[in-house]
Amino acid sequence: DIVYLTGIQQSHTGIEFEVSAQLNQMIRLDAGVSMGNWVYTDDATGTYRDGTEDKTYSYALKDLKVGDMPQAGLNLGLTATPIEGARVQALYRFYALHHSDWDPTSREFSDGENPDRNASWRSPSYGILDLNVSYDIPFEYSGVTSQVFLNIINALDAVYVQDATDNSRYNAHPWRVGNHTANAAEVYLGLPTSFNLGLRFNF
């Protein structure tokens, strides 16, 4: 059984802004912000073919938000170079307006029915702080230099929803109440605090 959907169209618009400033000899500030508006622009139709006849279905998509990606973000980075060869950076990342992933075929409706035009569940906004430290070892051998580094990802151990599926048929809350709610969503949490320590050689 195959359903052929036609007329699915999305509009992706938005703005991005980035700025950098060397505050003094040791401190550099980097910032960036983005805001998007990603929506389905019209309803769609689908044709079901079972080998003997075709049946047409309608799908209520117009003005619904595209899911599975945050539509707003903010980045702030502060980098310090206290001594020659040393670099310490704090990077804060903030994400918002993240609608959960959803299937357009779930919005099927027939003539005379009241279609479901409610947006998919929007997961909570969240922010993550990363810390990065590196030091260029002041030693060179035959053109080979080295650097030691430490990266701490999600340094504050924030708990956040990284991805979600709207109205999950598999992992929604067993006492789910209402469509397009947190109880009806399947969520994937982001990773807790992690770090990596390494030595890099440059040839």
PLM region descriptions:
Residues 2-104:
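Gram-negative outer-membrane beta-barrel transporters
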Residues 13-17, 72-76, 127-133, 148, ...:
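Hydrophobic, lipid-facing positions within transmembrane beta-strands of outer-membrane proteins
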Residues 67-141, 164-166:
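C-terminal beta-barrel architecture of Gram-negative outer-membrane proteins
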Residues 24, 28-30, 121-133, 152-154, ...:
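Conserved long hydrophobic alpha-helices within structured protein cores
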Residues 95-106, 136-203:
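C-terminal beta-signal and adjacent terminal beta-strands/loops
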Residues 1-4, 50-58, 109-115, 168-182:
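Surface-exposed loop/turn segments flanking beta-strands in extracellular/periplasmic regions
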Residues 4, 62-64, 118-120, 182-186:
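Short, P/G- and charge-enriched loop/turn segments at secondary-structure junctions
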